[in-house]
Amino acid sequence: MNDFKLPIYKYKDELIKVLKNHNVLIVESPTGSGKTTQLPRIIYEAGFAKLGKIGVTQPRRIATVSIAEYIAKHIGVNVGEEVGYKIRFEEITSPKTKIKLMTDGVLLQELKKDTLLYEYDVIIIDEAHERSLNIDFILGLIKDISRKRDDFKIIVSSATINTKIFSKYFNNAPVVSIETITYPVQIIYNPPLLNTSKGMILKIKEIVLNVIKEKKAGDILIFLSGEKEIKETIKELQELNSKKNLIIFPLYGRMPKEAQEQIFMTTPKNKRKIIVSTNIAETSITIENIKIVIDSGKVKTNKFQTKTHTYSLQEVPISKSSATQRAGRAGRLSKGTCYRLYKREDYQLREDYQKEEIYRTDLSEVVLRMADIGIRDFTHFDFISKPSTHSIQTASKILKSLDAINNKNELTEIGKYMILFPLIPAHSRALVEAMINYPQAIYQTTIGLSFLSTSGIFLLPQNEEMEARQAHLKYKNPMGDLIGFVNIFEDFKKALNKEAFTKENYLDLQGLEEIANVQMQLENIISKLNIPIIQKGVFDNEGYLKSIMRGMRDYICFKTSKKKYKTIKAQNVIIHPGSLISTDSVKYFVAGEIIETTKMYARSIGVLKKEWIDDIILNEEFKHNDISSKENQITNTGQTKIINEIKIGKKIFKAEYKNNIYVIKINLETLKEIIFKNELNNQNNEDLKKIKIQLMHKNITVFNNKKFLETIEIVKNMGKDWHCIKKYETKNVNIDEPEKMKNLLECTMQFISFPPKKNALFLSLETDYSGNFRLKPKQNFIMAIEESIESIKSLIENKEYIQKLHFIKKLINKVYKKLNYFF
């Protein structure tokens, strides 16, 4: 493609003229105008980098590297000469470099050394509409620089999303709007029959199949909320690829550069390319020949809970603005089609713009950077969107608990070391602890933190769950997952064929390569401080875990009941079933992560001794931070019940309306019919959120007053054969009784009647960990699930048991998958 034909070149003279006359310029345009690749070149060739550089920030590493390579190629130089880049742990620049691409995090690192950015004549903030925490912080810092440097130019480059806010923030800075030719995109609202992950994937498969059958032209771009959903969807779509005419690629942030670059390949003749992506493809990159978009309408966000210092992972609806951007991907080159997997009414109820990250994240990293560059009044920093005072105060308290800042909001000596590492404060504090007090554990700590800084590496392929779990068990350690991480790393490093190693052990190759890269760079930073790193000899596991514990202070967990723990701030923490640790014996541990999904789950466990904890956490803290179990209880207000009729699927039910909630009674078989005959196709999800259910089987209450959508998820996953059984094996069954074990597994999580109260009891699989298993009725469904998955894990983890039960391998995988769904 001829770059000079891109829409931005029609505005070249205007851009140069405005930038000469103003220090701040806002550029808005849709994706595909050429602003990302051509704006730096236009500014460079116009002579705006005579003394310094043009710095260009990108939110993501993939874009940083690929854009640098593109600009260098089209200017006619090698990367590292006039055009270079710098990302976390990698820099390719030289004294000749005039255009420097970098992630926004890198620019923040540079700001601490060069607070007025004298290295740069121009800073371009690209993708500013994403409004990440780093972008918002950078905007505040460079606004201050513009007051102090008359020669400093700022360009804020954004998609056509609320650009007025940028102009207003920079004292009504001029806006140049670049128009592009866009083609009409037909919007088709086509929600799945059931609004579940599986329902969404099947709907995508159906749409793709129809596109293929109807021989519609062009490649397909599918937007999903996360990596897990992407992998599951690709697995389902591969079933349509028997003729090998589909080229299916995933696209998400942590993929290596080589894998991500494949998506830009020209689609071969008689082939169709399908890209299954997160919101990274919404505005950041341009993929040619996309004519069909399938939009799930969802995105995943992490929300920091200031009360508990934990995160809740939420899948939320995208905004109208994001929906427009996604649809626009189909209309860049010709007419296109966008299938929205939600209803028109749902779209109309959505927010205009996505909520900015600054309102939902931990601000301790930003506050630490403020302290590093000499800002002392954290609460009055000039953010484009001001966070709450409470959020800033919480961040300050976290940093003080890590010994990173003092009462004057200045960096301590420990804080000065922490700021050297491109890690979150909790992680950098752990590394500094090892450097100061446990030098023998520095190497292990760099490995552990590298694992905690990246996404999970343990794979559980469909129908191979049992084999994968057994492979992972090789790295089970009584001191926890954190020790296992070190052993995985060492084996990966030694492996001559790393791809074969990861395949054999059901580990993610790309993830481990990323971990190795991060670990190496952490070592490099430490080495520059002339601190020796001991890699050989006996590892200091105690020093390693104590170091992690010091950084992750808020994630130190104390046992409160059989399977529950609490931290200083949070109650009812549960070890995630994916952990390789045996939970029953663990009284104290530190978690690498605590995140709330259906429950508050701790991951990446390191087992602690009580005496290690006493120096860090005083027991008194628990007394002052108890969370009342009575909090948030629903009380009966005595309001009058109102009887209504409500339609679900094709059936009408009587409903009691009370406290803004409908309560209906449904028979299990009726609900199965509604679900499995896809009768919920035209049901408004917002209406279903207002319904609670009494689920019955004949005269037995299966669930009482349970959220309707939650009940649908349970019944859908448990399947058509979920039923009440009259007889089951009540005695212990030994592993040497394979037929009886088969019966036990078939009955696991079925339910029985409890005559006195006519309530259902769920058959939980339990074990004595000595080869004996039994079914135990439980009133609580989730507790029965938790107990069952622990028991089946103990079964899978014993090779001798599996050999004896090899003939029911499919059944074991099926039960494990069913149980694992709830986590």
UniProtKB/Swiss-Prot annotation:
Tell me which UniProt keywords the record has, alphabetically.
ATP-binding, Helicase, Hydrolase, Nucleotide-binding, Virulence
Q: Which residues bind ATP?
A: 29-36
* Assigned EC number: 3.6.4.13
* Gene Ontology molecular function, alphabetical: ATP binding; ATP hydrolysis activity; RNA binding; RNA helicase activity
EC class of this enzyme?
hydrolase
Where is motif DEAH box found? 126-129
Q: What happens when the gene is disrupted?
A: Disruption of the gene results in the modulation of the expression of about 180 proteins and in a complete loss in the ability of the spirochetes to infect mice by needle inoculation.
Which reaction does this chain catalyze? ATP + H2O = ADP + phosphate + H(+)
Q: What are the TM regions of this chain, as residue ranges?
A: none
Tell me the InterPro entries matching this sequence: DEAD-box_helicase_OB_fold, DEAD/DEAH_box_helicase_dom, HA2_WH, Helicase-assoc_dom, Helicase_ATP-bd, Helicase_C-like, P-loop_NTPase
Boundaries of each Helicase C-terminal domain copy? 203-374
Q: What is the effect of changing residue 160 to A?
A: Strong decrease of ATPase activity in the presence of poly(A). Strong decrease of helicase activity
Helicase ATP-binding domain location: 16-179
Q: Which PROSITE patterns match?
A: HELICASE_ATP_BIND_1, HELICASE_CTER
Q: Which domain of life is it from?
A: Bacteria
The free-text function statement in the UniProt record for this protein reads: Has RNA-stimulated ATPase activity and RNA helicase activity. Involved in global regulation of gene expression. Could be involved in RNA processing and post-transcriptional gene regulation. Essential for both tick transmission and mouse infection.
State the family named in the UniProt similarity comment for this chain.
Belongs to the DEAD box helicase family. DEAH subfamily.
Would you tell me the protein name for this molecule? ATP-dependent RNA helicase HrpA
